[in-house]
From Swiss-Prot:
This is Translation initiation factor 2 subunit beta. It comes from Methanococcus aeolicus (strain ATCC BAA-1280 / DSM 17508 / OCM 812 / Nankai-3). The gene is eif2b. NCBIfam families: aIF-2beta, PRK03988.1. SUPFAM superfamilies: Translation initiation factor 2 beta, aIF2beta, N-terminal domain (SSF100966), Zinc-binding domain of translation initiation factor 2 beta (SSF75689). Heterotrimer composed of an alpha, a beta and a gamma chain. eIF-2 functions in the early steps of protein synthesis by forming a ternary complex with GTP and initiator tRNA.
Length: 139
């Protein structure tokens, strides 16, 4: 056999070994954890606007949900969310995850490629990947 030919299995193993690790991950969508700290009687989430950009939702809509879930008052000022009261990272991250499950991820295919659309008086979570539509209640 001529030395110009290579074994298919050897070439396949070589090609697979050169692929980046991200290719083998099942999840391509990861929500960053909230970077928060307590200052006096307030909690600041420093990367709130960055999180809202990753999940592709308006910061005000996202903040309204988090504030309602935590049962407190607050406001988005610049890139951060200011909450009245003392809240730990765990509780803030759990509310963010709940928001993502309800208002970002498609219930059929689980992909984050969704938009909130309005048809008539009803709001839907529409998946741009599979086309599924799920009615949602607004906050």
């Amino acid at each position: 056999m001529n030395s110009d030919y290579y074994d298919y299995d050897a070439l396949l193993k070589r090609a697979v070994s050169q692929l980046p690790e991200e290719v083998f991950k099942d999840v391509r969508f990861e929500v960053p954890h909230a970077d928060s700290f307590v200052e006096g009687n307030r909690t600041m989430v420093k990367n709130f606007v960055d999180i809202s950009k990753v999940i592709r939702r308006e910061p005000q809509f996202f903040a309204k949900y988090v504030l309602k879930e935590l049962g407190t008052a607050g406001d988005v000022e610049g890139p951060r969310l200011i909450l009245q009261g003392k809240f730990g990272n765990y509780i803030i991250n759990s509310k963010i995850k709940k928001f993502v499950d309800e208002y970002v991820l498609c219930p059929e295919c689980g992909k984050p490629d969704t938009k909130i659309i309005k048809e008539g008086r009803i709001h839907f979570l529409k998946c741009m990947a599979c086309g599924a539509m799920k009615p949602i209640k607004l906050i």
